[in-house]
Amino acid sequence: MTAVSLSDGTAVLKTDPWLEPFSGALRERYAAYQKQRTIIEEHEGGLAEFSKGYKSMGFQIDKNGGVRYREWASNATEARLIGEFNNWSHTANPMTKSPFGVWECYVPPVSPGVCAIPHDSMVKISMTLPGGESIDRIPTWITRVTQDLNISPIYDGRFWNPPKEQQYQFKHGHSTRPVEGLKIYEAHVGISSPNMRVTTYKEFEVDVLPKIKQLGYNCIQMMAIMEHAYYASFGYQVTNFFAASSRFGTPEELKSLVDKAHELGLTVLLDVVHSHASKNILDGINMYDGSDHLYFHEGGRGRHDQWDSRLFNYGQHEVLRFLLSNLRFWMDIYMFDGFRFDGVTSMMYKHHGIGSGFSGGYHEYFGDSVDLEAMVYLMLANAMLHETYPHVVTIAEDVSGMPTLCRPVAEGGVGFDYRLSMAIPDMWIKLLKEYTDDQWEMGQIVHNLTNRRHLEKSVAYAESHDQALVGDKTLAFWLMDKEMYDFMSDLSPLTPIIDRGLALHKMIRFIVHTLGGEAYLNFEGNEFGHPEWMDFPREGNGNSFAHARRQFNLVDDKLLRYKYLYEFDVAMNWLEDKYKWLNSPQAYVSLKHEGDKMIVFERAGLLFIFNFHPTQSFTDYRVGVDTAGEYKVILTSDETRFGGHNRIDMGGRYFTTPMEWNGRKNWLQVYSPSRTVLVLGL
């Protein structure tokens, strides 16, 4: 047996003895992390200081109005700062190069306190390459870029330095306590209204934040904030890592949005994309200094075949400074509370998860296929964030099931707080596409919902933005399809398809919420069964906004049945807020009955009874429960206010009998209508 040590990366063996054969790989990984961290400690004054690169790189404005500009571009032989402020002169502001390839210049103030570079004016760096060629680029640490389609689709870098009276002053800081029972509302600002146009930060703040609060979510995950030239990339082809997308408004307006969310008690996470970058050259960071390998791996290793994008070289010192400082920047300047890391699977493996099924065998997670440099970056990122911000939240998007992903770095883990349970939405889509309701296997549903790593927290969700993208469709549309166009009004007949769709949409969300993890996520609009799919304006659809919006008006129209699904979401979230099952130990499942299509489990002192049978209701159905007493109805999806048939007496009382049943000490008998969930409590 390997001796467990807190200092060599094998402490994770305490929580998972199956890692024993891979203790050598764990030691190697932790040693690589310690080596990189030691280099940073010795040469940069520590991880905390190293990750403050945004305070030294890019544009730094001193108290007298002078501007110092620094840029890493080791391949360039000459460099100069050009812009509207110097009439794009290639001689006015030359830069000098350090031995480490960092260029620098100082622009003195026009007069004391008066900056020579006007606020929001255009700037670029112009560089000469070894062959004599001259290239212009947008500064990599730029905080604002804009696009004027009347001139060009290429973005322009802008010097953002508003007068003090125009600078947003935060009234609220980061959360002072850990978030319990994380209920995440995944949102994209640009699609957040029924209008066929891009929604703004201000509109989101005024119109959407109150909805999120009222729905009972306590966290927002904001997509597509990092600037991306191609809107239809959903924000995943980032061009400018320190710039908040100008499509939606100004940096100050985003700060106001985050501050308002904090005022409402909401945690705000940024969907951060450090797994790859846009291959754009003129308005991105690709080929930045004329070389193929400044921020990225050279050649094929630096390119993602499926995403058509560039891949970072996580072993490069300046790349680590850039990415770690990027995290600090969003935390410090915009007051985000944490991150959902995109594409972690692609980062962790040299094959990027392409063509790998991941059987769950531990040999797949260690060895030559793992990108050790990327793993070290993720460990450094999580260590820096958790050491600097006590209540930060980090979530990994990983489909592989990497062990130790959500264990602390000090134990030898990768350091994330949560992982996304990506197999859960896949299961529902497969069931709805390939099986009739009477073919659903209760055991398989329970297995998929509870199959998660011991002591590694997961975010459960029935569907996210991924499921809604063009080529797929929302859960509601899988259930009800074209009948949603004609039969979602209370004035129209309740067809069998709509009746089934409403019932199952509620049950699917609720069983995921209660059984699936330690946190819950919903993509905006799906709380009320948003129809159709997501498709951003692009050439292939005539640049249409028809599917790049969220039709909140469907809920506001009280004649439509969407209100029932919405109200159930409200009830579900606020019930969790009261009983806190997401913070409770994993549920005890006492029944998975294939013939009856019944699932029964206990969690957080509540008894959950799901009847997935398409037609069969059960009278005096016996279910086991551990705690004796008189149980009452806490919630049922069959209530009229949720579009149900009101078949359950809300004032009913259920008394336990002290006799063992399904492995529990007591039993009680209930009426369980078909396609209904019943929640009982003492």
From Swiss-Prot:
This is 1,4-alpha-glucan-branching enzyme. (1,4-alpha-D-glucosyl)n binds at residues 88, 124. Pathway: Glycan biosynthesis; glycogen biosynthesis. The active site is at residues 342, 397. InterPro entries: A-amylase/branching_C (IPR006048), Branching_enzy (IPR037439), Glyco_hydro_13_cat_dom (IPR006047), Glyco_hydro_13_N (IPR004193), Glyco_hydro_b (IPR013780), Glycoside_hydrolase_SF (IPR017853), Ig-like_fold (IPR013783), Ig_E-set (IPR014756). Its main location: cytoplasm. GO terms for cellular component: cytoplasm. SUPFAM superfamilies: (Trans)glycosidases, E set domains, Glycosyl hydrolase domain. Belongs to the glycosyl hydrolase 13 family. GlgB subfamily. Glycogen-branching enzyme participates in the glycogen biosynthetic process along with glycogenin and glycogen synthase. Generates alpha-1,6-glucosidic branches from alpha-1,4-linked glucose chains, to increase solubility of the glycogen polymer. PANTHER family: 1,4-ALPHA-GLUCAN-BRANCHING ENZYME. Its EC number is 2.4.1.18. It is found in: Cytoplasm. The record marks 466 as: Transition state stabilizer.
